[in-house]
Amino acid sequence: MKLKITLLFLFIALYTNAQSKDLKFGKISEQEINLTQVPFEKNADAVILSEEGKMDLTSSNYYLTVKRRIKILTDKGLDEANIQLNYYSKNRNESISGIKGSTINIVNGVEQITPIDEKEIFDVSLNELYAAKRFTFPNVKVGSIIEYTYIKSSEYNFSIDAWNFQHDIPTLSSKFRLNNQAYGTYSIITIGDGLNTKYKGKSSSTEWLLHNIQSYNQLKYVYNPEDQSERVKIQAATYHTDGAKKTTMSAWRDLIQDINAQYDLYRNPSAIRDVAQNIPNGKDEVETLKNVIEYIDSNVKWNRFYGIIPTRSNKTLLKEKSGSTADMNLLLNEILTAKGFETSMVMFSSRHHGQILFSYPIVNQFNSVLTVVKLNNGTSNIILDASKLNKEQIEFGPLDVFNYHGIVIKKGDASFVKLNQKLSYYESSLKYDFMSNGNLVLYRKDKFNGYFYDDDIDEKNVLNRYLTESLDVRLDEEINDKTVFDTDSYVKNYKAKTVIPNAPFYTFINPLREFLKQYTFEDTNRQRKIEFNYPYLFNIQVKSKIPEGYEVIIDEKYKAHHKTELGLEYYQEAKVKDGQFTLAIQFLLPEGVYEADKYNELKQFFEKIKTESLKEVLMKKK
């Protein structure tokens, strides 16, 4: 086995060295023909054997020439033969041309080349802004090699997503060259651990080359794997809003003033006053806020469009009953202001859209807006998105909006705000009762809030999403109440029982054990921030009366308490008192994001607590 693995990686090393040369279509190697599996991502359905990009950048546009060669490894990989090349079609400022390609099969040791038929290349409209070139390779099967080339031209040369080295399938070799003939000043932004390690201190590079790149789906602890993938961006020292071009000296201020001015065209406090008056006030500000949320949720719906600038007035929105995120949040903001709340509208980039680069005030970094409401005399903030309101847990905004920072839409200087998440809480109580009639009964009650609950939750699997039962005994369900919201948490009650044999022993395991197994840390040179979905706290208690004739054996090393300077904390303890066995477990992850240099500290902490969670408690016959 060692020899086989060594030979596989030797092949990859030889292959990638060969691919450092320019990719020439129609000339495939024995290594490419014989490749059936990617050693560093063995479950891959297809692999990019080699790809090259060359960009000619001028002061008015750019031309990107792409060459790519892919091998199909499994039946699922056949989808890679369907190609879609998107481009910005409005005003015809972008285009894709020069598409050529072919399928290569080896039949009886001879190359069989089937070219793409130009008549089978289609130009399709995706929406009012974007179009795409679509084509499908002919005669494709498992083992086929497909290769294609095209040229993308664009007049949008102020903020360019120049080249992606990492894709949704692994890549053996990826090369990008830049020929900068522009007169203006441009910054090269490299994203990804591989690029930033290899080209650290080489800011003047015009050629980049990476080998053996895992698919971005393999990236762990990132909100948006594609956004955090290995790639190069090219950024001009200017920005555009609706055709305007401005220097970066006071660019953020200018940008937000432009946005705010467009909002002023749609703000109409007097028109919304009557609407606000018809929404009843509650006994306190929280109840009033909930009444406003109920009104928005009942009267307008999201049309599935994200936007940073409204396209409808409040009156039109209420009449049409459907609008974009910008339309809906403007209405929410205006009503709350009329009800006496202190509010702000914040422009942000959602997790699925990508992170903001603060050094470059570009409006297309943002894709939506949200509403921030101050409560308790300004001591607490509630983050709301009118398009995705949580009527029961108003303090927990949509998870997708929590992507570091946003910028307040207002007059004056630019003001960035951090979008902080509230801690989600999970409490579970498991009580085992060994009955004198030979039955074992489990009474379980779980309470949870925040992001431990979502609308897509499967009622049958609510209790199995995060915790397992402590006794590995098959129980028959007796009571399985529907999950209900009570005051500030969701509550689930469950009862099950079984007839048990007169077993010599029973083993109590840690209910959090399986959940903790997902936390693996395998990066060797992490340079990305570590992003967890949300901060949380677990509080778990297992209880059981000790049956007559049995005793509980607790290892003296079972008790554990681990705490880090980062605030993470884990505690477990087992004890016996007055004939009852109790197991207590707590786990706190206080923040959603940690800096890259904390990776090893996090790794060590999780390895410790995973080891602790493997410990068991034995209840055996005396």
Spans of model-derived segments:
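Bacterial Sec-dependent N-terminal signal peptides
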Residues: M1-L23
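C-terminal accessory domains/tails appended to large, multi-domain proteins
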Residues: Y536-K545, G549-K622
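Extended non-catalytic domains of envelope/secretory-pathway proteins
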Residues: A261, L265-S270, G307, S324, ...
